[in-house]
């Protein structure tokens, strides 16, 4: 039995809002693992140095949140296909020989939350992915692997949506999924699942797509959680859709990171249920 707890952290700026320490502490408690998991606020230009300092202190792994996910991938000596395709990493594993492995568990977390926690099969679904930034890039690959029938990436800047689609075109062809890009002003069909990966929730802006994209009982999923997602969820509810925020995605992506680090699958559904039970309390809501 280990006498000292292994050290992990979440790196970001801002970082005070992060629920990751509480989630990983609960995972450790339920699995009997001895870990210490901290928040670490880094200067905007200080990610590489902060990562080196953490490694020098014996750190075993770290979660990475905004704005450092792209830089985290560059700092790694090896990366998963998921991270490479996304162009960003949210999970780093630090090894005894000084090497660093990068992965991106965001999309796995999203797929797990939709399929296991919400009970919705993704195979054969038509999906609208709103946004073409880092959040969208992190989930597009796993959505393709999940066997969806069609994905439309809609973004205010059409060129960004087109670039994201182009970077995933080979995988889409392999998975026999129709994948296309459009601007937010383009006519849109209706969809089984609408995923908001845009910054509209954080900005408090109106939902960037019309209600006509919704089918009866469509899943309307905001990757944010708590107050940040409320406007989108209210919009979905008003139009007869099934609203869901990204709290389950947060827990499930953390569970994937825990498995990468510890080789154990934590009881993520139990931890999510505990967080949902406390959902009536005020919650900040954005990222890892």
UniProtKB/Swiss-Prot annotation:
Annotated active site: 69
Enzyme class: oxidoreductase
HAMAP family for the chain: Shikimate_DH_AroE
PANTHER family registered for this protein in UniProt: BIFUNCTIONAL 3-DEHYDROQUINATE DEHYDRATASE_SHIKIMATE DEHYDROGENASE, CHLOROPLASTIC, SHIKIMATE DEHYDROGENASE
InterPro entries for the chain: Aminoacid_DH-like_N_sf, NAD(P)-bd_dom_sf, SDH_C, Shikimate_DH, Shikimate_DH-bd_N, Shikimate_DH_fam, Shikm_DH/Glu-tRNA_Rdtase
GO CC terms, sorted: cytosol
Record keywords, A-Z: Amino-acid biosynthesis, Aromatic amino acid biosynthesis, NADP, Oxidoreductase
Name of the protein this chain belongs to: Shikimate dehydrogenase (NADP(+))
């Amino acid at each position: 039995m280990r006498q000292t707890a292994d050290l992990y952290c979440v790196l970001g700026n801002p970082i005070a809002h992060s629920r990751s320490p509480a989630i990983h502490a609960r995972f450790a408690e339920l699995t009997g693992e001895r870990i210490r998991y901290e928040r670490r606020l880094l200067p905007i230009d200080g990610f590489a140095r902060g990562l080196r300092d953490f490694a020098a202190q014996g750190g075993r792994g770290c979660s990475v949140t905004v704005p450092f996910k792209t830089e985290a991938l560059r700092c790694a000596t090896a990366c998963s296909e998921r991270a490479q395709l996304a162009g960003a990493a949210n999970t780093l594993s630090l090894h005894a020989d000084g090497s660093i492995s990068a992965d991106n568990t965001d999309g796995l977390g999203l797929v797990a939350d939709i399929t296991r926690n919400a009970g919705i099969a993704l195979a054969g679904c038509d999906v609208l992915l709103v946004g073409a930034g880092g959040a969208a890039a992190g989930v597009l690959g796993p959505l393709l692997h999940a066997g969806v029938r069609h994905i439309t990436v809609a973004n205010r800047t059409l060129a960004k949506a087109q670039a994201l689609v182009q970077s995933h075109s080979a995988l889409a062809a392999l998975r026999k999924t129709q994948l296309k890009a459009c601007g937010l002003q383009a006519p849109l069909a209706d969809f089984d699942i609408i995923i908001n990966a845009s910054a509209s929730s954080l900005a408090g802006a109106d939902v960037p797509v019309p209600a006509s994209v919704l089918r009866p009982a469509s899943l309307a999923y905001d990757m944010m959680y708590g107050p940040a997602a409320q406007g989108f969820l209210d919009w979905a509810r008003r139009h007869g859709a099934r609203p869901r925020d990204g709290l389950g995605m947060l827990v499930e992506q953390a569970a994937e990171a825990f498995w990468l680090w510890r080789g154990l699958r934590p009881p993520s559904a139990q931890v999510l249920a505990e967080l949902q039970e406390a959902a009536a309390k005020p919650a900040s809501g954005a990222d890892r």
